[in-house]
Design a protein with these regions (language model features):
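Conserved catalytic core of sirtuin-type NAD+-dependent deacylases
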Residues: 1-195
Length: 195
């Protein structure tokens, strides 16, 4: 397949700027591509994470049967590796646009927390979050930083010793209902929707 590159002309930048300035309600949608400059590879593609790891550890059935093996990979990729990444210019630019009232909401598929670390506030995490863990037994929620510092894997619920699962979407799980609702709500309110 031939590689194509797309370059915006100055007129395109001016037009985009005008649209953003004129919009009464702007929603921005981001995916893995925005975090590549921060050193986080995308999941799919030539250098994607799934070329290095078998993604089956993110199936709920596999996770429950093999919690230690699953958590070792989850911790390595989504906590140890992702926590070393810093927001890039795009994350900071988006946060600045939001601060100035030019972006009203950010819908992201990412669970790397880089939008939050850059200062963005109104973020809908479409695929959930890595910041919290939920006990599969008693459903209590916990801050992942507090429970994962010990690196005892798999982490267990301090109340019932149940298995804790990160609050991001595994392959066979639906999008969290609140994320789905808010994404639909903000998208329908958008005068300008930026992909």
């Amino acid at each position: 397949m031939e590689k194509r590159e797309f370059y915006l002309k100055i007129d395109d930048y001016q037009l985009a700027t005008e649209w953003i300035l004129e919009s009464k309600y702007t929603v921005l949608f981001t995916g893995a591509g925005i975090s590549v400059e921060s050193g986080i590879p995308p999941f799919r593609g030539e250098n994607g994470l799934w070329t290095k790891y078998n993604p089956s550890f993110l199936l709920t059935s596999y996770f429950i049967k093999h919690p230690k093996e699953s958590w070792e990979l989850i911790y390595e990729i989504f906590y140890k590796y992702f926590n070393q990444a810093n927001p890039n210019k795009a994350h900071y630019f988006i946060a600045e646009l939001e601060k100035k009232g030019l972006i009203n909401a950010i819908i992201t598929q990412n669970i790397d927390n880089l939008h939050q670390n850059a200062g963005s506030k109104n973020i809908i995490e479409y695929h959930g979050t890595s910041r919290t863990l939920t006990c599969l037994n008693c459903t209590q929620k916990f801050d992942s930083k507090k429970l994962l510092e010990k690196e005892k894997l798999p982490p267990q619920c301090p109340y019932c010793n149940g298995l804790l699962k990160p609050d991001f979407v595994f392959f066979n799980e639906p999008i969290p209902s609140e994320s789905q609702f808010l994404s639909n709500k903000y998208a329908s309110m958008a005068e300008l929707f930026i992909l």
